[in-house]
Amino acid sequence: MKTLISNSKKVLIPLIMGSIFAGNVMAAGPYAVELGEAGTFTILSKSGITDVYPSTVTGNVGTSPITGAALLLNCDEVTGAMYTVDSAGPLPCSINSPYLLELAVSDMGIAYNDAAGRVPADHTELGTGEIGGLTLEPGVYKWSSDVNISTDVTFNGTMDDVWIMQISGNLNQANAKRVTLTGGALAKNIFWQVAGYTALGTYASFEGIVLSKTLISVNTGTTVNGRLLAQTAVTLQKNTINAPTEQYEEAPL
């Protein structure tokens, strides 16, 4: 009998361990920021969207409470819907939907406050604000200064891992520099909460959800995989802006 119990344990232990590893792997880092209706937009702005033609935007675009006349993208630049609070938006494609936009803008503010309020931070003042050249693990990062991406930066984690970047100053990405994802990390799980402005340099590559208190400026030729959610304006210059995907895609070399 004793031998049978012992043998049973020998059988049960690997079965239990196998079931643990076969199950869902727990995500590292904080839980994701809930975007609500703001998460249905690739670009959302309270005071307007300017553009140097041509840009390409995949996903929905919206402006509120400012008039639709401040949404300066052309219909052929957007694969998705363009929502405005009145009939002054781009013709013939803009959709007058003030209630949806009011809700989305409210949710954008709630998401910003949520991201800004996450405690405790796992990393504070990392690199004294210079994160270029670093590989970042999942977690909450906090700076009381500007954050600069002067060389390429890497986010390494699984598809379920989450990063929240709490930035009290501005976010600056240098020209032709890249935000790179490895290990399965997804742009939809990287949240940049920026109290100042966000400036992405020319021909750069950026990943993540930007929740900016003020301006988001995307300079010539830059590609963004994520969302641009600004409490003031968004400026584009011949850019490619794609809503984040649900699956990991290896970045081209």
Swiss-Prot record:
**How changing residue 232 to Y affects the protein?**
Has 50% thermal hysteresis (TH) activity of that of the wild-type
Q: What does this protein do?
A: Binds to the surface of ice crystals and inhibits their growth. Has ice recrystallization inhibition (RI) activity (the ability to prevent the formation of larger grains of ice at the expense of smaller grains), which may protect membranes from freezing injury. Has high thermal hysteresis (TH) activity, which is the ability to lower the freezing point of an aqueous solution below its melting point, and thus the freezing of the cell fluid can be prevented protecting the organism from ice damage. The TH activity of this protein is 3.8 degrees Celsius at 14 mM.
For this protein, the record's InterPro entries field holds: Ice-bd_prot (IPR021884)
List locations, semicolon-separated: Secreted
Instruction: Extract the coiled-coil ranges from the record.
Output: none
Disulfide bridges in this chain: 75-93
Record GO cellular component, one term = extracellular region
| Membership in a protein family | Belongs to the ice-binding protein family.
- What happens when you mutate residue 232 to K? Increased thermal hysteresis (TH) activity compared to wild-type
Motif segment (Ice-binding site motif (T-A/G-X-T/N) 1): 220-223
Please give the organism. Answer: Colwellia sp
| Name of protein | Ice-binding protein
